[in-house]
From Swiss-Prot:
GO cellular component: nuclear origin of replication recognition complex
Record's compositionally biased regions (Acidic residues): 220-236
Organism: Oryza sativa subsp. indica (Rice)
Biased composition (Polar residues): 254-264
Name by which UniProt lists this protein: Origin of replication complex subunit 6
Localization per Swiss-Prot or TrEMBL: Nucleus
A Pfam match: ORC6
Subunit structure: Component of the origin recognition complex (ORC) composed of at least ORC1, ORC2, ORC3, ORC4, ORC5 and ORC6. ORC is regulated in a cell-cycle and development dependent manner. It is sequentially assembled at the exit from anaphase of mitosis and disassembled as cells enter S phase.
Amino acid sequence: MDMSSIASRLGLSGSRPVVGKAAELRRLCDVTFDSSVLGIGEVCKAIICLEIAASKFQVIFDRAEAVRMSGMSEKAYIRSFNALQNGLGVKTTLDVRELGIQFGCVRLIPFVQKGLSLYKERFLAALPPSRRASTDFGRPVFTAASFYLCAKRHKLKVDKLKLIDLCGTSSSEFTTVSTSMADLCFDVFGIAKEKKDAKSIKGSRELLDVLPSKRKHDDDSDSSGESSGDDQDELDLPTYKRHKKMEKEAYNDWKSSVLSSNKQTKPDPAKPRKQAQLNFKKKPSDMALEVSSAAN
């Protein structure tokens, strides 16, 4: 497939410098080594060259569409991308100033630079001396993760997917680096999270009042420990809860009245009970039968 047709399908047909640089990288790849040894086909090689060229010119590249066109999984594509990039000796760089200008967050530049330097110091201090020399902090994912965390801390909206596409990494690797930075440099990147009670927020409280089933457990626990308060306190209660309390009070009044009436109608257990004698008047025919039976 021709490079220009692949670029048009990826939405890069209007960027002539990107297409020219990708064609140059493809020729360099053919001269330097055989990409088939790495398991990279011709179409995938052209797509990776386009992505490297797009990252070099700071042009947005649709990686999801590129993975779909290559016919590979995301992990296999990233592995092939890194192998081809290392084979060509090309390293993508991501400047903090360019990110600040592109996303409209110029005031974050000093915070990002401070956080990156602090993360490097603390990360290297935690590593053994034998591994410190091989650690590479020049990868764009560190700059992008630092920029994203600073924007999140200062409550600025930044497109995370756009950042991931710019740094040329996967979402899982970006999340891993972001978590590591937030853990090591919580004073620079961390965000204090406090779980607020839903009843303390006015909007949530009104929403819960509309859905009585959501407050069932709260009503049961509150009604067991609450006593009858003032009229002002009752007015402050939500509508559903106020009706519930009125129904409970009416039920208690009815229950007490029933119990008191039962006590009044109940006989006194101290008095002895006497069985009444039943004297029925006998008919003359019954008396004649008794006399005849006695005579026999």
